[in-house]
Amino acid sequence: IIDYYDEGEEDRDVGVVDAR
C-alpha cells in the first residue's frame, strides 16, 4: 500500500511505500 504524506524528510516525492 502507498501512503501519501508530505513530511519532507526523505529526498523523494510524496507517496512512498510506508517508509517512515
Swiss-Prot record:
Residues 1-12 have a biased composition (Acidic residues). GO terms for cellular component: extracellular region. GO terms for biological process: adaptive immune response; blood coagulation; innate immune response. Coiled coil: none annotated. The keyword Coiled coil applies. Cleaved by the protease thrombin to yield monomers which, together with fibrinogen alpha (FGA) and fibrinogen gamma (FGG), polymerize to form an insoluble fibrin matrix. Fibrin has a major function in hemostasis as one of the primary components of blood clots. In addition, functions during the early stages of wound repair to stabilize the lesion and guide cell migration during re-epithelialization. Was originally thought to be essential for platelet aggregation, based on in vitro studies using anticoagulated blood. A long coiled coil structure formed by 3 polypeptide chains connects the central nodule to the C-terminal domains (distal nodules). The long C-terminal ends of the alpha chains fold back, contributing a fourth strand to the coiled coil structure. This is Fibrinogen beta chain. It comes from Felis catus (Cat).
